[in-house]
């Protein structure tokens, strides 16, 4: 909680990320050199935000959401401070479970999907043998086991 924090927004449409995200971030950081954090609602935009922070010499830290492998690699390299990742396999299982229950007229159940906060302290758990992140690593397999048991697949 930061009662004295101020928040500004720099909105760049997804279709414009490649042409505007870096320059808009650079312009903002140049005008606001005391910026502490940049929050990217989609981590795919960080491929443009990271170079902007570096080119301006800003000390702003980057945090983001999604868990896209290259963004998790940015956590490993220290370019992103924190990333909230979602397990796509769990989301896929939950989606199929919902659709199957609907088709079979079964009662729906509330099923949380898995999220994990990636930082420099735990990011190695998301890496494969080559030291790169890939989807599905680092979230465990409890959801897969549970869905397979529910649907008689194990």
What are the functions of these language-model segments?
Residues 1-154:
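A residue-level marker of the well-folded mature domains of exported/periplasmic proteins
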């Amino acid at each position: 909680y930061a009662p004295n924090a101020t928040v500004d927004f720099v909105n760049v449409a997804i279709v414009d990320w490649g042409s505007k995200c870096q320059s808009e971030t650079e312009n903002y950081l140049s005008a606001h050199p005391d910026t502490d954090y940049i929050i990217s609602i989609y981590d795919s935009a960080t491929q443009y935000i990271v170079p902007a922070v570096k080119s301006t010499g800003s000390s702003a830290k980057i945090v983001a959401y999604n868990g896209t492998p290259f963004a998790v690699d940015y956590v490993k390299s220290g370019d992103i401070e924190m990333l909230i990742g979602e397990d796509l396999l769990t989301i896929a299982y939950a989606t199929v479970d919902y659709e199957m229950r609907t088709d079979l007229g079964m009662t729906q159940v509330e099923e949380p999907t898995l999220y994990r906060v990636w930082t420099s302290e735990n990011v190695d758990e998301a890496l494969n043998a080559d030291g790169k992140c890939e989807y599905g690593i680092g979230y465990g397999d409890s959801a897969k086991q549970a869905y397979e048991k529910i649907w008689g697949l194990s």
